[in-house]
Regions:
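Polyanion-binding surfaces on beta-sheet-dominated domains and ring/shell assemblies
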Residues: 1-240
Length: 240
């Protein structure tokens, strides 16, 4: 019989030293790449995610273009060296599905109708993964889109919450994601007060779910504040 590993100690401290509501440290480096229209290196704890935006540009193949709006193309990939066990470089079903999930989360904010017959390409490259990469990917993509000057109704801010050792905790790391009882990634759009991605693995009661949702929105608001600060620092120059 294997004993379940304790992930939160009696003092309420998690394996990486955080309290149950604490997020991992976040670092945002805008304009990280020279050849993209917009880019960011987004670090959240051990997660290191590069997002690059190209466009709006002509659509190839031509028949894929839409007469009334731009198409968003999202490619989420994990580098072979991003996980503890080397991952195959071939795209997995998970990566293809997450590319679609992320595109859906972004489609509700990008003003695609301003750029008919064009494509906006968003690349999300996970260089190092430590759980929550889909929501960190959406967070990073919004920053890269803003960096590219693409108009949006709001900025998507993501964070996962979950149930670990019977408690609802914010921003799960890899071991909490794998060994915890539930994992719930969400993406929130503060300017619209709307959620554009919500998934859940595992089991929670209705009460726990309500608590998780409220903690997820609070966490996303903290992420949003950091996104806004990073964009203001780069783009709002104080006149002297
Ligand atoms: O990353 P996210 O939580 O959005 O997606 P997941 O499918 O729930 O994966 C959770 C974590 O498992 C990832 O962030 C990686 O740390 C890890 N993982 C892995 O080690 N190898 C894979 N092929 C896929 C995920």
């Amino acid at each position: 019989m294997s004993l379940k590993k304790q992930l939160i100690n009696e003092q309420g401290i998690r394996t990486d030293g955080r309290g149950i509501d604490d997020l991992r440290p976040i670092k945002i480096t805008l304009g990280y790449l020279a050849h993209a229209n917009g880019s960011v290196l987004y670090e959240q704890g051990k997660n290191k995610i590069l997002a690059a935006v190209f466009g709006p540009s002509e659509v190839h193949p031509k028949h894929a273009e839409l007469p009334d709006r731009a198409i968003l193309r999202v490619r989420y990939r994990m580098a072979p060296f991003s996980t503890e066990e080397r991952k195959s470089p071939a795209p997995t079903r998970r990566e293809i599905e997450l590319s679609m999930v992320i595109r859906n989360a972004l489609e509700s904010v990008v003003l695609t109708e301003l750029f008919p017959r064009t494509a906006i390409d968003i690349f999300i490259e996970v260089l190092q993964a430590d759980a929550g990469t889909r929501v960190a990917g959406v967070t990073a993509a919004a920053l890269a889109l803003a960096d590219a000057g693409i108009p949006m109704k709001g900025i998507t801010a993501g964070c996962a919450v979950g149930k670990v050792d019977g408690k609802i905790v914010c921003d799960l790391n890899d071991i909490e994601d794998k060994e915890g009882e539930a994992d719930m990634p969400i993406v929130y759009i503060p300017t619209l007060g709307k959620i554009s991605l919500l998934q859940m693995d595992g089991l929670m009661t209705q009460e726990e779910f309500k608590q998780a949702l409220s903690k997820a929105i609070n966490s996303a608001m903290k992420v949003y504040q950091l996104q806004v600060n990073a964009l203001k620092t780069k783009y709002i120059k104080v006149e002297r």
